[in-house]
């Protein structure tokens, strides 16, 4: 029988057409214009899973308002470290996106980024005290110097009129606001980046193509077996470097790669739902991302928010996310994803993480059992005047939280984003969930540093990275003048007004 397998050779293969692969592809092509890149995506369009606007839990994560990034310590103080690192990373993303706009590599910034204030909102004496402590810990840092805090009823009404409707002046309430917050449509941004990439010499983008097998050859290069889901045609792609950026699909692919660095990793899938507002009058009354505090015992990804989004030019309002449990790793995945991901090398970490996270299990069971009435009740904590007829339930994306081997051999459930790379730098994979997309540029620059060690230190690559990201190799949280200059410049290019 004739072998009809199509064979190809490249320098880089990107698996998954989401924000991470788009970012890595564009940066590598800028650094080395003659680099040959192949991109494989199992769906028929880019950014249809985790990067899509309706699937993305928190767009524009910059740690201005997400309280899970500033945990309260036992002594009542607040640790600002994680919030500072995320805010720093978001500034890097803003610089890179500005570069893309200035160079006409992506169309007008209005397509993917808008000014939307970021607010934190709490009630009850203990939470008000926490928010004030958080404000004091963050506001002295240049990244957060524009943050405002208030407990004044009239002031809060000005900041978030819809949230304050139906409340009494004697309620114990507090909020912070950051006027420079943004809403980012990562689906639109990702598709624009792939549209640009696809037109370049040496870039091939394949939709409806599923990666079935990965094998490292003796010469350290990789052979990837791929099936065209439309025609059934088989392909073999040979490449020097593989990046797996397939969202929830990354873990099964890491397992197929059979590298020692992947041992002990597991994944815990969490599905999501939103309440979406259908009343244009209500949508028009709210212009902010208002984040609350997760209830006691709930995991950090459960932080509720009432969120203004601009999706495909239309203003939208959503509340959530409500979590659920599904054994799928992707919205378009299989119910066998979780059971098939359990292997001998990750069984103990998986069981141990389950045993050590009883509150998470309890929380998910409660969420799954919620009735429409329960969801509206949760919404009314944020919008007391909400009417159930103005809201519908929408399915959001799948998140796969990382489980990794702890020091004692047991499992630790991680709530962040994790990059794993092989020692020889020929394969890298991104696992995990938030902050994800917002910090994609920092994550990919770090990945390039790990996997292209020789090239990244050449004067040529360094100069190009500095051109794309003016603050490259510098921190902004301790350089107020540089931060102000960069924020001003990126706000201008990205058309972020302060209305």
Protein language model features and the residues they cover:
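Short beta-strand to alpha-helix junction loop
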Residues: 81-94, 122-129, 176-198, 206, ...
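C-terminal catalytic lobe of FAD-dependent flavoproteins
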Residues: 171-180, 188, 325-457
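Glycine-rich FAD pyrophosphate-binding loop
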Residues: 29-53
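Helix-loop-beta segment of a Rossmann-like dinucleotide-binding subdomain
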Residues: 108-121, 158-201, 359-363, 425-432
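N-terminal Rossmann-like FAD-binding beta1-loop-alpha1 element of flavoenzymes
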Residues: 10-38
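Dinucleotide-binding Rossmann-like beta1-alpha1 core, especially the glycine-rich loop
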Residues: 58-158, 316, 328, 334-337
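Helical element adjacent to the flavin cofactor pocket in flavoenzyme catalytic cores
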Residues: 173-241, 438-452
């Amino acid at each position: 029988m004739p072998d009809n397998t199509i064979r190809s050779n490249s320098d880089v293969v990107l698996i998954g057409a989401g924000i991470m692969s788009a970012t890595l592809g564009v940066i590598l092509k800028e650094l080395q214009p003659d680099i040959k890149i192949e991109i494989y995506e199992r769906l028929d369009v880019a950014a249809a899973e985790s990067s899509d606007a309706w699937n993305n839990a928190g767009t524009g994560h910059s740690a201005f308002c997400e309280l899970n990034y500033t945990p309260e310590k036992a002594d009542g103080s607040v640790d600002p470290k994680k919030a500072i690192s995320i805010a720093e990373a978001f500034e890097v993303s803003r610089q890179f996106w500005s570069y893309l706009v200035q160079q006409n590599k992506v169309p007008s910034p209005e397509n993917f980024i808008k000014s939307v204030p970021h607010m934190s909102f709490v009630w009850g004496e203990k939470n008000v005290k926490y928010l004030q402590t958080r404000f004091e810990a963050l506001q002295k840092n240049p990244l957060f110097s524009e943050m405002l805090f208030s407990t004044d009823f009239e002031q809060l009404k000005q900041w978030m009129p819809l949230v304050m409707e139906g409340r009494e002046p004697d309620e114990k309430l507090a909020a912070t606001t950051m006027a420079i917050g943004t809403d980012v449509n990562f689906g639109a941004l990702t598709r624009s980046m792939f549209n640009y990439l696809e037109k370049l010499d040496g870039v091939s983008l394949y939709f409806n193509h599923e990666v079935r097998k990965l094998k490292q050859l003796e010469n350290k290069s990789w052979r990837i077996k791929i099936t065209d889901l439309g025609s059934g045609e088989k392909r073999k792609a040979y490449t020097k470097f593989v990046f797996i950026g397939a969202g929830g699909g990354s873990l099964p692919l890491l397992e197929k790669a059979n590298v020692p660095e992947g041992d002990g990793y597991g994944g815990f899938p969490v599905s999501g739902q939103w309440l979406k507002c259908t009343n244009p009058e209500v949508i028009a009354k709210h212009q902010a991302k208002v984040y609350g505090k997760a209830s006691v015992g709930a995991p950090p990804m459960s932080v509720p928010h009432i969120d203004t989004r601009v999706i495909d030019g239309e203003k939208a309002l959503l509340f959530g996310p409500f979590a659920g449990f599904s054994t799928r790793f992707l919205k378009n995945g299989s119910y066998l994803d979780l059971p098939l991901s359990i292997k001998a090398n990750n069984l103990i970490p998986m069981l141990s993480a389950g045993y050590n996270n009883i509150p998470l299990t309890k929380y998910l069971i409660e969420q799954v059992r919620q009735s429409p009435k329960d969801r509206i009740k949760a919404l009314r904590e944020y919008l007391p005047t909400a009417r159930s007829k103005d809201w519908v339930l929408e399915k959001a994306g799948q998140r796969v939280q990382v489980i990794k081997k702890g020091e004692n051999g047991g499992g630790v459930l991680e709530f962040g984003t994790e990059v794993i790379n092989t020692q020889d730098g020929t394969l890298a994979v991104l696992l995990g969930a938030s902050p994800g997309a917002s910090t994609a540029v920092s994550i990919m620059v770090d990945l390039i540093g790990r996997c292209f060690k020789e090239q990244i230190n050449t004067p040529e690559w360094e100069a190009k990275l500095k051109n794309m990201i003016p603050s490259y190799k510098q921190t902004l949280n301790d350089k107020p003048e540089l931060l102000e200059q960069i924020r001003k410049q990126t706000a201008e290019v990205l058309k972020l007004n302060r209305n």
